[in-house]
């Protein structure tokens, strides 16, 4: 089955080759039909983000998801480079 979640995963793996990629479907916490794929939380760790601003990281992720972004109602993005993630890994 080609779910939105699996497409997000495929596109981000291809574009960023992350060392950590956690995609959490949070749709169940919202007033949507059972099994909906509309709200996601994303934690992505890649050295591609080293010395890149948060805004540019978000833009790069949205660009990678360009083909499916209209299918997603909400996307919470937490992008890190390796060093940042090591400092914050207790929280993610």
Predicted feature residues:
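Short, non-transmembrane amphipathic alpha-helical segments
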Residues: 8-12, 55-67
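Solvent-exposed beta-strand sheet faces enriched in polar/charged residues
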Residues: 24, 43-45, 76-80
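C-terminal structural segments of small proteins and small subunits
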Residues: 62-92
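Short secondary-structure junctions
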Residues: 13-22, 69-72
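Short edge beta-strands and adjacent turn/loop segments
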Residues: 21-40
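A short interface-forming secondary-structure element
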Residues: 41-54
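Short, glycine/charged-enriched secondary-structure capping and boundary segments
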Residues: 36-39, 57-58, 92
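N-terminal presequence-like segments and adjacent domain-start helices
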Residues: 1-4
């Amino acid at each position: 089955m080609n779910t939105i979640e699996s497409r997000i995963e495929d596109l981000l793996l291809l574009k960023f080759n992350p060392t950590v990629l956690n995609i959490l479907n949070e749709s169940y916490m919202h007033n949507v039909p059972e099994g909906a794929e509309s709200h996601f939380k994303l934690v992505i760790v890649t050295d591609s983000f080293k010395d890149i601003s948060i805004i540019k990281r978000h833009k790069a992720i949205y660009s990678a998801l360009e083909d499916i972004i209209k299918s997603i109602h909400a996307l919470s993005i937490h992008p890190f480079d390796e060093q940042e993630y090591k400092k914050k890994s207790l929280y993610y």
